[in-house]
């Protein structure tokens, strides 16, 4: 079977084995008090926890958020998940590693910051796991933009208006919307602000919502002077 994302051949699931369950858990914006009760209950009884990192030797905000609730006997692994075509071999090894754990009957938690279905590594993982008929359960988490809106006391959307959510490199997608959420804007913050001001938007920028060093910035000057 070929994975639809990276065209690597995988073995099919062994129907004679009793597989564990993969739990994709969203831990919210990065504050342990914002984990759901369901997430905590699963963490307390899981056998394995896998926390993806965006960089080799990187840390995991998701793991730091969940660590106080993880079963003391659970195995914990930090895994680098580069979602790029040239990194197929590394991605393949990570997938196979998790499949092996599941085939041993272990219940495996895959942590994500925010919600598992919003700009998450879990989305790629889920497609692979579905193709192999593995046991999966997804636990939602509070998204970063919902957390940010709460901190800033800023309405996200109202009535029957649409809400557009986009990354900072897709400003061309902005048409006549009244409500926007722009994520992953840090590489082109000036262009983002220029576009918002051109379109007549009022804006607020929230960084590290509910985490140490959180900032709520309401002017262009504050945003441009803020250090990441």
Where are these regions (language model features)?
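Class I S-adenosyl-L-methionine
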Residues: 1-32, 37-134, 220-222
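Well-ordered beta-strand positions
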Residues: 46-48, 154, 179
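A short, acidic, amphipathic alpha-helical segment used as a generic capping/interface helix at domain edges
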Residues: 97, 101, 167-173, 187-192
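Class I SAM-dependent methyltransferase SAM-binding "motif I" and its flanking Rossmann-like core
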Residues: 117-176
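Structural signal for conserved beta-strand scaffold positions within catalytic alpha/beta enzyme cores
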Residues: 51, 77-80, 138, 158, ...
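Short gly/pro/ser/thr-enriched loop/turn and capping motifs at secondary-structure boundaries
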Residues: 56-59, 84, 143-146, 211-213
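A polyampholytic, Gly/Pro-enriched intrinsically disordered region
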Residues: 94-101, 155-167, 222-228
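A contiguous loop/helix-start segment that scaffolds small-molecule binding in enzyme catalytic cores
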Residues: 22, 174-228
């Amino acid at each position: 079977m070929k994975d639809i994302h990276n065209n690597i051949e995988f073995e099919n699931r062994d129907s004679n084995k009793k597989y564990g369950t993969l739990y994709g858990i969203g831990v919210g914006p990065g504050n342990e008090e914002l984990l759901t009760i369901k997430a905590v209950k699963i963490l307390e009884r899981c056998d394995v926890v896998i926390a993806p990192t965006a960089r080799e030797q990187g840390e995991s905000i998701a793991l730091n958020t969940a660590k106080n609730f993880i079963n003391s006997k659970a195995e914990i692994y930090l895994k680098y998940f580069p979602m790029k075509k040239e990194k197929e071999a590394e991605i393949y090894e990570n997938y196979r590693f998790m499949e092996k754990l599941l085939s041993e009957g272990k219940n495996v938690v895959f942590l994500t910051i925010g919600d598992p279905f919003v700009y998450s590594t879990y989305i790629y993982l889920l497609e692979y796991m579905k193709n192999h008929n593995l046991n999966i359960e997804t636990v939602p988490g509070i998204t970063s933009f919902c957390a940010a809106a709460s901190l800033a006391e800023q309405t996200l959307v109202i009535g029957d208006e649409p809400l557009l959510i986009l990354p900072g490199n897709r400003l061309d997608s902005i048409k006549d919307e009244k409500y926007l959420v722009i994520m992953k804007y840090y590489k082109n913050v000036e262009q983002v602000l220029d576009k918002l001001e051109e379109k007549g938007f009022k804006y607020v920028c929230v960084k590290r919502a509910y985490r140490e060093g959180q900032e709520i910035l309401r002017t262009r000057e504050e945003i441009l002077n803020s250090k990441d």
